[in-house]
């Protein structure tokens, strides 16, 4: 298999895997619709997912990486739909509007700033890539609290093994793809994603679940690589 064909195959499988990962939010929204309430859950993961995918979409357009563009068009659309569903069923609509307004402001400010660098395309790509990495790393910081809880309780039953394993595979695929196309902005966040997933998988070995269910795991605790 040629290098070009291998790159194409890897990017295609990575896109498919990532979209399936994004679709995990649909199960949560389904519960909102069934209960006609969001309960005490937060809409921040959906809103931040929209922000992350929007930035990566911008990066994909600037670098002409079609796989990045495709997966983040799908991702930003899904997270926007999830946010709208959350808004419909939450009692705290004002907070949701404020959070989404803040995210939109950040998005617009970054786009306007990078557009001013149009004559310096490499710098435009560099700045956008840094922003993408920062946003993604912030996602990866979210599960750390749950990891500390598992370590204190010495019980990993609150962690969903299938979702964590999927996250590892997705991050690994994008990491390899980033290496193949020599893109450090794709490599760095997905390397961190692999490490985080391995840490969580390691907790299953160190602290086996006493009665595994995984129901306590919330979307906020799952990082989104793209």
From Swiss-Prot:
InterPro entries per UniProt: SWEET, SWEET_rpt
Main location: Golgi
Transmembrane portions of the chain: 9-29, 43-63, 68-88, 95-115, 130-150, 161-181, 185-205
Membrane topology: Multi-pass membrane protein
One GO term of the biological process aspect: salivary gland development
Record-level Gene Ontology MF annotations: sugar transmembrane transporter activity
The entry's keywords: Cell membrane, Golgi apparatus, Membrane, Repeat, Sugar transport, Transmembrane, Transmembrane helix, Transport
Pfam families per the UniProt record, alphabetical: MtN3_slv
Statement: the UniProt record of this protein carries the keyword Cell membrane: yes
Domain of life: Eukaryota
Domain (MtN3/slv) ranges: 9-93, 128-210
Subcellular location: Golgi apparatus membrane; Cell membrane
GO-annotated cellular components: Golgi membrane; membrane; plasma membrane
Protein family according to the UniProt entry: Belongs to the SWEET sugar transporter family.
Function: Mediates both low-affinity uptake and efflux of sugar across the membrane.
Full protein name: Sugar transporter SWEET1
Annotated source species: Drosophila melanogaster
């Amino acid at each position: 298999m040629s290098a070009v064909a291998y790159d194409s195959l890897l990017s295609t499988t990575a896109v498919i895997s990532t979209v399936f990962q994004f679709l995990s939010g649909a199960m949560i929204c389904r519960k909102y619709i069934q209960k006609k309430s969001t309960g005490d859950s937060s809409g921040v993961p959906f809103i931040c997912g929209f922000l992350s995918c929007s930035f990566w979409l911008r990066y994909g357009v600037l670098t002409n990486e079609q796989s990045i563009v495709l997966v983040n068009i799908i991702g930003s659309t899904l997270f926007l739909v999830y946010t709208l569903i959350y808004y419909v069923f939450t009692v705290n609509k004002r907070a949701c509007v404020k959070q989404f307004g803040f995210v939109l402001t950040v998005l617009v400010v970054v786009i306007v700033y990078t557009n001013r660098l149009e004559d310096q395309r490499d710098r435009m790509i560099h700045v956008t890539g840094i922003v993408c990495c920062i946003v993604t790393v912030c996602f990866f910081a979210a599960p750390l609290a749950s990891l500390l809880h598992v370590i204190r309780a010495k019980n990993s039953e609150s962690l969903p093994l299938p979702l964590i394993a999927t996250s590892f595979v997705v991050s690994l695929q994008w990491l390899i793809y980033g290496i193949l196309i020599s893109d450090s902005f794709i490599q760095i966040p997905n390397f961190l994603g692999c490490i985080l997933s391995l840490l969580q998988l390691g907790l299953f070995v160190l602290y086996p679940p006493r009665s595994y269910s995984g129901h306590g795991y919330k979307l906020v605790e799952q990082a989104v690589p793209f």
